[in-house]
Amino acid sequence: MNGSVFQKDNKFYLKVKGSGEFEMGLVSEGYRKLSTLIYLILSGSLNKNAILFWDEPETNMNPKLISHVTDALIKLSQMGVQVFISTHSYFVQQSFNLFAEYQNKGKNKLDIQFMSLYKDIENGKLKCEKSKDLSEISHNAIMEEFDAIYDKEQELIE
């Protein structure tokens, strides 16, 4: 993000290089979310040993900004912030999966866990499945729907 966040007269603003200052209520949801992260970091609220819970960070966000959010969350984790997110987004899930599989190496390797909550068909109980490897999660509604739409597309083009 090519800007900075500041507070003036009890209001938050985003200052964008070459574009001016914008009251936070007037910027897009994606920039507002990124700005909030920046402000929490600069104010010291998100530091080593802090915990961040974020439900569906992709909600109301331009898909082009999702990688910036996932990159920021990974950097926060590398700084020592424990990050928990929930998502229904293929893009968010795959961004973390690609990082975990191909980039999460070395002495600062993060302990990334993928989890899926689902209802057991046999007894109706809520269950949790977790793994360090996303491909080992068998109850993955995101991938199930991705596969279903892919199969539908294949049927339509044949």
Give a label for each model feature:
Residues 16-157:
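Switch/communication elements of ASCE P-loop NTPase nucleotide-binding domains
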